[in-house]
């Protein structure tokens, strides 16, 4: 019976046109869904503001906030540490003011709030400053938005956070530089991400031959198309998994028949036969 009552209330709200009545329902009704529906029906900015300021329920505040247009009020909410972080972040998303976002990015005490502000900034010089921030998550968000190749290379070399190095690599296009990262990175995932962006065959061969990481060798080999080189690996490499990778890219059917007959490892036989 109670569920029917709540369902009826929610249906009733859909027919209410009085903004004041919708406000009262939003603030005081017993059923949470009915309250949310009432907020969705409110169109007057003054009423939405009152609902936002007078409700203690975070979800209801967020629903009202989605419809609030006043930049002044949104900025006040974004700056107020007394509000939940998700409310402040929602306010930041609705603000259209680069200089205001910079203030938040520089001075706010909440890491997630700073990151949200940084994610909306387009000023490359400012983003470069934040890419040197003491807080890794702020650096991470900033580096994703930077296009300066030389700056990204420097961060890839100097930052000590693998996630940030990885993000820098994603926007670097210098193949020789990526090879150096692939061969010299201490973190295997970072080295792998560099290989993932390399297309030049001579660089992939060098990485395969010189990398200390198995996954990096595997990735490089999987991108090599030179048939003569692949045949050498298929015959001479001591690791059966790498021989399989090489064989899977070889097109010479007679060669594959020979490997199926002569290789001592069962998985290599199967790869040579079935690809």
Residues covered by each model-derived region:
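Alpha-helical scaffold segments
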Residues: 1-275
